[in-house]
Amino acid sequence: MLLRTAKTVLIGLLLSAGLLAAPAHAASLSGDAWKVAPLAEVAAPGEQVSMPGYNDRAWVGAQVPGTVFGSYVRAGLEKEPTYGDNIYKVDKAKYDRDYWYRTEFVVPTGDRTGKIWLNFDGVNRDADVFVNGKSVGGMRGFMQRGRFDITTLVHIGGRNGLAVLDHLPQGGANSASPSFICSGGWDWMPRVPGLNMGIYKDVYLSRTSDVSLADPWVRTVLLSRARADLSVQVQLADSSAAPVAGVLSGVIQPGGITFSRAITLGPGESRIVTLDAATVPALRVRNPRLWWPNGYGDPSLYTCHLAFRVGGAVSDAKTVRFGIRKYAYDTDGGVLHFHVNGVRVFPKGGNWGMAEFMLRCHGTDYDTRLRFHREMHLNMIRNWMGMTADEAFYDACDRTGMMVWDEFWLNSGGGLPSDVHVFRANAIEKIKQVRSHPCVALWCGENEGDPAPPLNDWLRADLLAYDGGDRRYQPNSHAGDLSGSGPWRNLGLKQYFRNVGNGSNIGDYGMRSEIGTATVPALSSVKRFLPLADLWPRNALWVQHFLGPTATNAGPDGYNGDLEARYGQAGSAADYCAKAQLLNQETMKAIYEGWLDHIGSGASGVLIWMSQSAYPSFVWQTYDYYYGLTGAYWGARAACEPAHIYWNADDDRIRVVNTSLRSFPALRAEAWIYNMDGSQRLHVAGRVASRPGTAVDCFMLHYPLGLSATHFLKLRLTDAAGAVVSENFYWRGTKYQRYAALNDLKRVKLRASSRLTTAGGMDTLRADITNPASSGVVAFAVQATAVRGQADTAILPAFVSDGDFSLLPGETKHLTLQFAHAQAGKGPPRLAVDCWNNAPKFRPAVDTGDLALDRPASASSTDPDGNGPDAAVDGESTTRWSSALGSDPQWLRIDLGKVEPISRVELLWETAYAKSYQIQVSDDGVHWTDIYRTVAGHGGAEDLPDLSGHGRYVRLYGTQRGTQWGYSLYEFKVYGPQATR
């Protein structure tokens, strides 16, 4: 094993001077002075392991906060798990067992009065703690905090030993709860060796006198714009054998609000003290600064500093940050609506599976992620199954106005935890830890299910007891005044604007907790997690990063089919990833715009699955694992702006939606249509007024003659002073969702200039990018990147004011690109500009040759929902033919128009597939010849190569269903021998 030089944590002057009013983390034991070793390889008991000087030279250096497996990766004993298939090759048995953590520390000489406490903010999953040869206690469950009195155990001025025996989470999913239950693997992240066991939060020493404070809570009890009545609660504990009389005092800032109360505690007494505006007039705040969700106002924050003094000396002190706000809810029409500070708000947000799949997200990492969410104009994050537990996450959400839909650690159908009482204790711990955060907007008991008895009743009662009933308790994440979850794959644009009764696959709008699409990142990011040899064509490594059967809910076959049908066959990884960004953008924009289109008429909010990336993958993200901004990011950012002009792709109305607190009485809406050469073909304008919480019509688009096969729609909304309120840009095909003509866009040479400034540790590039008036072509999907070094390496993370935008001839875009100065590296950062028609695109040598595309189709039957046979040959993998339910045989017939040689057929099944079927050909549509037959159909994507036959008609003849339903095909593709398939 790797040897590590012993380190000792030196607890500095704050302890020697007394930590009475210092922040809890001032005497931190976190850092890299720890070591780990498996219990099976350590013969000594905890009493010996925790003695100063114990021989741990053969142990592996560890980082706290962190995990056991993460420590081995950090030490170079395991390859980086995100790259290639490295994580799939790890010997999981090596980590799926109990481990010791160990460190030593010194408490300097000085003030020897009062109590010294050893504090743990979180260990996954159970832990036993030893100090200087003595067991001091333990923790059960990953939310349980540990606070141990070690006053009589530590050697002041000498070395002290600390050992923690960390126990592996046991059982699957709910059985292991409370824990990071998705660490066992999900359809967006691999299984993590050791299931993320480790000391994953901070460890620190604190010092108090006899009375200590815990769990301060500032609550908004009553609220109006002119006044807020607050209550302040804190737990006081006397650890001595004598009564203690003192004064609890507080200061709230801003405002300089002060208050105090004399309190006497009995020997060993622990008491919850609550102060409210009825008894403490200072807690009635006039003209409060309110906390608002992003887009509705500023997320104003206050701090409350509490101290308990005995004889004028501080015994203990705590500071809590809070926001003045009030949540309320209604379920009008059976739809859940959120209200903040008396205003109905529209949640636009995303799900977080985890912050990082190995718990390697800390501190400012959350600030980066939350800034991306704020700049996408999102206002809610669903903390899926409570898998993000860091205080820094909630702090960042508070600062950015990001509401949190917060959950407990249960998955649908997973049964009960192995110890329901440990679960309950952890749930109470979580409530106490996060209840002062204004961002927490809702509590949810279980992912896609109801907590099994007795947990549901316990959670409801404990939230009332410990959170005062201030937030709604929602037992089930997708039922009970919610509109369900899914689909998680991309659909046709029109479907996002249609309700369930109008041919849609999304169901009723309502409040949707999950809906999403596969999201392939840019090539520069793919190169960071796939070896060059595996970049193209798609292969098993793509599947291991979840573009394949590892993530069937993402519809990878449909995603690939749509990409090809809309943008043409991809000839390289670069071509594929470039086309993917366009698909990502138009799909994500349509999801949000489809929901916003129904604001006030059945839609109350939507959370995409997912808005952030915990592992480098091809699915469910807006920015990727490396902070690369995908087309989905730009689609979300465009759609979610507070006042927004958009195109309803289903009925061609131009509309304006308003999810702000501002009214716009006099707006001018304009629409232009341009051909690919930049020539204007249409201009329409109209006046419109927009009120908060509404979507209103501007005008209907009527398309002129002479449009290029792919053309562009530009929208602009200006106020009475002519200032731009919103702009939007779409590409459209004369044939629905067919944009292959973009591959023939004339090359364009853009002009760009930039200037660099540095302030507050941040670099800012201010750029001007121009498409010359003489270009004679639209500059499509322009991207600006800050780069460094000779290799033009992208500087990430970077906050860019716009991306994947388009420029008409003569247009200029003004941009800012901001990033940490430390990220820039050697030499000045530079601006790199590229666009779709600045790079060659793959063009097949011959037509791809789907002979069935848009040909006449007929079928033996069609289901009552009207999924007709033409849908199987429209090149759109989100529409389908469905037969009548429950009968065999059934058939689907295509008329190719003339006799054609046939060498290949591709089938893309919906869930209802054929187990036994034949592919048949005919010259006259009466007499049929089999060219393929099987009794082992498996559904999904079936590629049938090396066929031999000819005919004008091709028929799929199903004789045995694979499910209890009928037959349902997304796509039926037919190829001749000259096709490039």
Residue ranges and their predicted role:
Residues 29, 51, 55-64, 131, ...:
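Disordered, acidic Ser/Thr/Pro-rich linker "stalks" and the adjacent N-terminal cap
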Residues 380-551, 579, 583, 587, ...:
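Substrate-binding/catalytic cleft of secreted carbohydrate-active enzymes
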Residues 285-318, 701-742, 820-847:
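Terminal connector regions
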Residues 37-41, 75, 96-213, 239, ...:
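Accessory beta-strand-rich segments of carbohydrate-active enzymes
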Residues 29, 36-44, 58, 63-67, ...:
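Substrate-binding clefts and catalytic carboxylate motifs of secreted carbohydrate-active enzymes
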Residues 70-107, 111-120, 124-131, 137-140, ...:
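Active-site-adjacent substrate/metal-binding segments within catalytic domains
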Residues 259-287, 676-708, 795-822:
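Intrinsically disordered, low-complexity Pro/Gly/Ser/Thr-rich segments with frequent PxxP/GP/PP motifs
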Residues 164-168, 957-964:
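Short beta-strand-plus-loop segments that form exposed binding edges in beta-rich domains
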